[in-house]
Structure formats: structure tokens, C-alpha cells
């Protein structure tokens, strides 16, 4: 069964605060966004492991300031879609939740902020330069990613030039170990640290002092919030030399499912509410820092 997306009262906040942040986004990012729109590659869509023919909105070709940029990546060798060697053609690990979660979140960014957001996502291949046209980049299930040396170098350059990376939906000690092995190649001399509760990213739009573990759809059947041995959620990140958060690492949670299943009446609404609030803050932070 489906439910309507979260209503406006679910995310109520002072209008003045929205307008101040929106003005900051325009002043900080407006000129750069105009240049980026001119160079963005055309929209492209791939078959996903959960959705193969997702309907397109009418305005899917419109240029915009912000686009949900989803990282395409090769994964560790393995059976099925996880180890698909033809990952550039879709039906691979990077397409988990895609494109439903991307478009549901894009709708909320449009509704809750003054950021001009496109209604559809853009898959990003680090083997070309399109990544530099997008200030915010998301990756799912990074406990399985397996970036090449060339992709690692491009990824590092993107972050140091002002890009923001958010990753999500990986669980337990084994997936964490593999994720950090890759990130240590991206930044050999930068530590992954816990994001302090007073960091701007937790307060730029919504005050997120009362965060909790957001589970995936499996909660509907299992009634447990964790997966594998990931019993507690972790909010970690990597900062640049000026104190800007470059990478927000959401470990032992599944925010992507909270966006994807925003219209699923069986999925608890409180998970979608928090998942959306976190994403709105992260996107706004990326656009204003």
C-alpha cells in the first residue's frame, strides 16, 4: 500500500530560517551553479536491481542548481548484481534503491527549501569529469565498492575542490573495514572522526539533536533496526584543512530506504521523517559551504 509523501507539518520550521539559508545558498553557489548547468551531461537512466522502468516526470530534462548525483562504482567480485562486471550499464550494486529514493528526496528538497532542484537524479561515473558539475554526491552500500586508482584520484580531487560526499546503507564491522580501506587510499593522511553534535550540518535547517538509527525496509518484517553486527548508528565524517565537512559517513543505518519508502504505508513514518530531515540538512550544508 502507498501513502502520501510526508506533509508540510511533518517538517515545520520558521519561514525566516528557510529564507536566510536560501539566500546564503544563492550567494554562495549561484554563479557556480550557472556555470555547472551549462556543462552538465544530459540526463541518463539505467536499469536498477529494484526498478527497471521507472516513470519520468515531465520536467526531467530541465537544468537546475542542485541534482541528486548518485555515484556509479565497480563493486567487489561476487555473484549476482553485486559483482556485475558491466556496472556501467546498471543492474549493479550502486543502483540499490535507485531511482525511487533519489526522486522522492529531490521532491522534498524542492518542497522544503528554496534550492532549485531537478526532479530526477544523475548517475555519476568517475571515469569522466561530470562529477565536478555537482556539489553533492551520494553513494549506497559502500561496504562493497571497489574504486580503481584513477577513480580514487578523481574522487579526491572532487572533494578537495569543494565537493560534498554522503554515503549510506552499509552495516557491521566487515563492511566498515572494506569502506575504510578504500577511503584510506583517497585520503591517506585524513582521519575519519565522529561528527560532533554541535556541527553546523546537524543544525543548518533542522536541529538534529535527537537522531536515532533509521533502518531499511527489512524492519517491517524483522522489527529490528540493525543489520549484521551494526547495532548502533554512527555519524562520522572527514574534514578539510579549513574545517569544512567533505564526507558524511552514515554507517549502520539505511537513510536511502527511508527516502525510497516514503510512500509505503507499512514503513514507519518516523523513519522517513528523520531520514528526510538529515538529507535536507546535508544538501543545504553542501550548497552553502
Please state what every model-predicted region is:
Residues 2-22:
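Bacterial N-terminal signal peptides that target proteins for export
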Residues 21-30:
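Bacterial N-terminal signal peptides
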Residues 37-136, 142-143, 246, 254-289:
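Aromatic-Pro/Gly-enriched surface loop or interdomain linker
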Residues 68, 131-176:
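Short alpha-beta junction capping motif
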Residues 102-106, 152, 156, 176-180, ...:
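Extracytoplasmic/secreted envelope proteins and their assembly/folding machinery
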Residues 115-125, 167-172, 190-198:
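Surface-exposed patches in mature extracellular/periplasmic domains of secreted proteins
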Amino acid at each position: 500500500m502507498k501513502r502520501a509523501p510526508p506533509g508540510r507539518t511533518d517538517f515545520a520550521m520558521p519561514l525566516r530560517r528557510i529564507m536566510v539559508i536560501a539566500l546564503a545558498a544563492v550567494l554562495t553557489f549561484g554563479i557556480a551553479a550557472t556555470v555547472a548547468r551549462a556543462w552538465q551531461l544530459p540526463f541518463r537512466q539505467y536499469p536498477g536491481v529494484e526498478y527497471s522502468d521507472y516513470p519520468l516526470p515531465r520536467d526531467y530534462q530541465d537544468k537546475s542548481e542542485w541534482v541528486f548525483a548518485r555515484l556509479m562504482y565497480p563493486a567487489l567480485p561476487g555473484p549476482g548484481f553485486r559483482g556485475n562486471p558491466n556496472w556501467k550499464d546498471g543492474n549493479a550494486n550502486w543502483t540499490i534503491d535507485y531511482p525511487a529514493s533519489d526522486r522522492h528526496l529531490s521532491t522534498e528538497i524542492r518542497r522544503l527549501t528554496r534550492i532549485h532542484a531537478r526532479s530526477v537524479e544523475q548517475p555519476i561515473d568517475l571515469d569522466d569529469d561530470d562529477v565536478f558539475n555537482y556539489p553533492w554526491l551520494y553513494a549506497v552500500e559502500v561496504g562493497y565498492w571497489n574504486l580503481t586508482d584513477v577513480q580514487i584520484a578523481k574522487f579526491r580531487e572532487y572533494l578537495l575542490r569543494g565537493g560534498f560526499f554522503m554515503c549510506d546503507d552499509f552495516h557491521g564491522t566487515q563492511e566498515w573495514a572494506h569502506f575504510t580501506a578504500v577511503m584510506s587510499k583517497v585520503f591517506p593522511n585524513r582521519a575519519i572522526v565522529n561528527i560532533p553534535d554541535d556541527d553546523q550540518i546537524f543544525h543548518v535547517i533542522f536541529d538534529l539533536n535527537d537522531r536515532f538509527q533509521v533502518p531499511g525496509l527489512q524492519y517491517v518484517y524483522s522489527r529490528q533496526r540493525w543489520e549484521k553486527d551494526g547495532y548502533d548508528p554512527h555519524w562520522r565524517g572527514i574534514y578539510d584543512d579549513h574545517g569544512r565537512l567533505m564526507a558524511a559517513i552514515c554507517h549502520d543505518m539505511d537513510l536511502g530506504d527511508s527516502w525510497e519508502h516514503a510512500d509505503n504505508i507499512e514503513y514507519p513514518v518516523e523513519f522517513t521523517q528523520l531520514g528526510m530531515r538529515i538529507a535536507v540538512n546535508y544538501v543545504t550544508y553542501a550548497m552553502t559551504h
